[in-house]
Amino acid sequence: MENLNAYFKSVIDQDTASVVLCDLQHTILYMNPAAIRNYAKRGGAALIGRSLLHCHNASSNSRIQEVVDWFAASPEHNIIYTYHNEKQNKDVYMVALRDADGTLIGYYEKHEYRSPETMERYAF
């Protein structure tokens, strides 16, 4: 099978929800275009290479580390619900990133919007 990395990157790049990938030291490795736009007031693309922990308060940082520790405790621990954003009507999860051997290599925040789509169907 050919290398699928370009396909996977394109899937993430086209997602309308923010995707921010972090390593286990909480360094932001990648932000998709939606994340760059959504976090523009906090620095947008300039956040890449910086610590995600600098974007949160001490309480949030503690919870982030608690979740990462939980991910590390078992290869069965891969997703956890973190909160509901009422204003944007979305649920937010933290998701473990693992290599082919199941070793934890990082994490990302997953946004699931609950509002009905407003885009016209098949609006070419």
What are these regions (language model features)?
Residues 1-36:
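Sensory modules in modular signal-transduction proteins
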Residues 97-124:
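Sensory coupling linkers of modular signal transduction proteins
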Residues 75, 79-91, 99, 105:
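Per-ARNT-Sim (PAS) sensory domains and their PAS-associated C-terminal
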Residues 45-59:
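PAS-family sensory/regulatory domains
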Residues 58-79:
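Soluble sensory domains of the PAS superfamily and closely related sensory modules
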